[in-house]
Each structure stands twice: as C-alpha cells, then as structure tokens.
Design a protein with these regions (language model features):
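N-terminal interaction/assembly modules
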Residues: 1-72, 79, 88-91
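Short, well-structured alpha-helical patches and their helix-loop capping segments
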Residues: 76-80, 97
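Single conserved hydrophobic/aromatic residue that forms the stacking wall/gate
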Residues: 95-103
Length: 103
C-alpha cells in the first residue's frame, strides 16, 4: 500500500486539537504517528518537528504574524492562525523540508 499523506495537514490537525480543544500534544501526535505507521521515517520526523517546534515557539510566531498582518492573531480563525504559525515556523526556524511532493 502506497498511501500518500500530507504531513502538513496532519500537523495542522494536531495543532488544532491542541490549541482549540486543550489536548496534550504528545498524546495527539503519538496517536497520529500510530495511525500512519506506513509513513516514511523522514515524514514522521518532519511531522514531529513541525508540531513540536510550532508549539514551542508559538509566542514568537504570533508576534511575527502580528507585525505583518492586518488581522491580529487572536482574532483569526483557528485554521488560518495555525497555518500561519506553521508557515512562519518553517520559514524562520526550520531549515529542511521533507520532500518536494509534499509542498
């Protein structure tokens, strides 16, 4: 079985569970990694780094987003807010991408 999965979408789902529903990131992330065991090792590592890094740097990421957005982070829809957080984290703090096909 060669199912393809969008790791960024999975990261977004984890972040939404954590930020909007108060779930524990390690538990949600573990459940996702168990569900998608067929993912390549580099994809699993990227997913973990993206989720953990975005959560770890959330205050700084929100500050950067607020500097460039007309809409303040706190007023954004949760999906938009977390997509922007992940994007800023990748651009500013994460130096590698898992694969060109996951862009």
């Amino acid at each position: 079985m060669t199912d393809t999965v969008n790791t960024r979408r999975l990261a977004l789902d984890v972040l939404l569970e954590v930020t909007e529903h108060g779930a524990y990131s390690n538990q949600v992330l573990r459940a996702v990694l168990e569900k998608y065991q067929y993912m390549e090792k580099y994809e699993r590592a990227f997913l973990t780094r993206l989720v953990e890094g975005t959560i770890q740097h959330m205050i700084e990421l929100d500050y950067v987003i607020d500097q460039f957005s007309k809409v303040k982070v706190k007023k954004m829809k949760p999906v938009i807010r977390n997509i922007l957080r992940m994007g800023v984290y990748q651009i500013c703090l994460l130096y590698t991408s898992p694969s060109p096909r996951d862009s």
